[in-house]
Amino acid sequence: MVDENTQDNAPEQEEEAAIVQAGPVSSWLTENGFDHDLLEPDHLGVELIKVSPDFLVPLCTALYAYGFNYLQCQGAYDLGPGKELVSFYHLIKVSDNCEQAEEVRIKVFLPRDNPHIPSVYWIWKAADWQERESYDMYGIIYDGHPDLKRILMPEDWVGWPLRKDYVSPDFYELQDAY
């Protein structure tokens, strides 16, 4: 026998489950007037925050001042052919006598035809080679980076090899080049 109340409340329960609760970092950003969107936390419960490219540097500067002094990882990925590219930043608050470090991941969604984003090198020097790798593999241009050039591929390489719409050069073309 099916309980009618359970059936009637199913859409409401789905809506409540779809609402992402603001975590401590997002709440702090909202209290201080920083525009951002919440994404669902990852499988470890790390807060995910979406921000537009224009607000990346002000938001990251605020997070640095708030104590997120360690850029653990910067990377990028492709959502698929014709879809957006994503640049992400995994930040950690490192402090003395901390039992559990606070973490947050910032994501910036970029159009694949013009993937420009400001560099965070001037906030976290660890972004240097990580942004270069994202540029080299996905073609994301980090405006203001002091030395944005290829880091893994030869400098004369054509294209962005980790984009999902990348067409690999023929093996023999590569072999003949050397």
Swiss-Prot record:
Intracellular or extracellular location(s): Cellular thylakoid membrane
Keywords assigned by UniProt, alphabetized: Membrane, NAD, NADP, Plastoquinone, Quinone, Thylakoid, Translocase, Transport
GO BP term, pick one: photosynthesis, light reaction
Pfam family, one: Complex1_30kDa
TM region(s), chain numbering: none
Main location (coarse class): membrane
Catalytic activity entry: a plastoquinone + NADH + (n+1) H(+)(in) = a plastoquinol + NAD(+) + n H(+)(out); a plastoquinone + NADPH + (n+1) H(+)(in) = a plastoquinol + NADP(+) + n H(+)(out)
Cellular component terms per the entry's GO annotation: plasma membrane-derived thylakoid membrane
GO MF terms, alphabetically ordered: NADH dehydrogenase (ubiquinone) activity; quinone binding
EC number(s) recorded for this UniProt protein: 7.1.1.-
Entries under InterPro entries matching the protein: NADH_DH_suC (IPR010218), NADH_quin_OxRdtase_su_C/D-like (IPR037232), NADH_UbQ_OxRdtase_30kDa_su (IPR001268), NADH_UbQ_OxRdtase_CS (IPR020396)
Keyword Coiled coil tagged: no
Membrane topology field: Peripheral membrane protein
Domain of life: Bacteria
Keyword presence, Hydrolase: no
PANTHER family (alphabetical): NADH DEHYDROGENASE [UBIQUINONE] IRON-SULFUR PROTEIN 3, MITOCHONDRIAL (PTHR10884:SF14), NADH DEHYDROGENASE UBIQUINONE IRON-SULFUR PROTEIN 3 (PTHR10884)
Family of this protein: Belongs to the complex I 30 kDa subunit family.
Stated role: NDH-1 shuttles electrons from an unknown electron donor, via FMN and iron-sulfur (Fe-S) centers, to quinones in the respiratory and/or the photosynthetic chain. The immediate electron acceptor for the enzyme in this species is believed to be plastoquinone. Couples the redox reaction to proton translocation, and thus conserves the redox energy in a proton gradient. Cyanobacterial NDH-1 also plays a role in inorganic carbon-concentration.
Quaternary structure, from the entry: NDH-1 can be composed of about 15 different subunits; different subcomplexes with different compositions have been identified which probably have different functions.
Protein name, per record: NAD(P)H-quinone oxidoreductase subunit J
